[in-house]
Amino acid sequence: MKKLSFQQIILTLQNYWQDYGCGILQPYDAHVGAGTFHPATVLRCLGTKPWSVAYVQPSRRPGDSRYGMHPNRMQHYYQFQVILKPSPDDIQDLYLKNLECLGIDLKNHDIRFVEDDWESPTLGASGLGWEVWCDGMEVSQFTYMQQIGGIECRPVACEITYGLERLALYIQGVDVVKALDWNGQIGEKALKYGEVDFEAERQFSKYNLELADSKMLLRHFKDSEEQCERLVKANLPMPAYDECLKASHYFNQLNALGVISVTERASYVLRVRHLARICCMKWLELSGE
């Protein structure tokens, strides 16, 4: 079987979960640190209404900036997120069948579910979880979402997160992200991951670690914090949550610059968590839950 390209992996995941009945959503147009931060997870996992969706989410972690020189760590990367609420009883079987669709023969590989409970301090979110290892390499994360914004999830939703670069490294049998086959073409039409993303990786690394203006970021954080609280009071939790995401990203940028002390870091985490919580509470209130 021909090894899937990066974009074929995404299309295969989308088709598989679409056939299961998930709505295929688009990436959220904001700077987020992980697919979990998409409002389709944070807001929609709350409340009692069923919700089954899947989407790709480009994600940014300024602290992982390496100027494009690290084999598998970048400040910008892609995740594929699946949310199933309520969680189906056969979720593990569904996941394993999905691996087979990606060309991973379960009979010839060691698939393990390794307990790894998940927590996001800035979202006030946590859940029971497992890393999925294939021949000793983590390829996905399972989480039974128990709370978001400090609010209990009823019913519990299942979140499956695929680290697309890591999954592609395994499927294609290469060691360096920039060498990944992006589009499955040959000759002039062939694209490697490095051709698509690595100049941006170099430039954003320089910005994140050297040129970002910490005083400006501190002002922006405070502005987004105030705006979020104002919008919640105006019964607009969705634009308020956008401001929460901005504040979270500004915090991550400040952290990458190394200008926040350990004590200050804890304070900033609590401030972002408060914003996430009031957005979630207002969302539930307006939903009649």
From Swiss-Prot:
Any one annotated GO CC term: cytosol
Protein name: Glycine--tRNA ligase alpha subunit
Locations listed in the record: Cytoplasm
Catalytic reactions on record: tRNA(Gly) + glycine + ATP = glycyl-tRNA(Gly) + AMP + diphosphate
Gene3D superfamilies: Bira Bifunctional Protein, Domain 2, Class II aaRS and biotin synthetases, domain 2
Lineage: Bacteria, Pseudomonadati, Pseudomonadota, Alphaproteobacteria, Rickettsiales
Domain of life: Bacteria
Cross-referenced Pfam families: tRNA-synt_2e (PF02091)
Family note: Belongs to the class-II aminoacyl-tRNA synthetase family.
Species whose genome carries this gene: Rickettsia akari (strain Hartford)
Entry's transmembrane regions: none
InterPro entries in the record: aa-tRNA-synth_II/BPL/LPL, Gly-tRNA-synth_heterodimer, Gly-tRNA_ligase_asu
Gene name of the record: glyQ
Enzyme Commission number, as recorded: 6.1.1.14
Subunit structure, interactors included: Tetramer of two alpha and two beta subunits.
One Gene Ontology term of the molecular function aspect: glycine-tRNA ligase activity
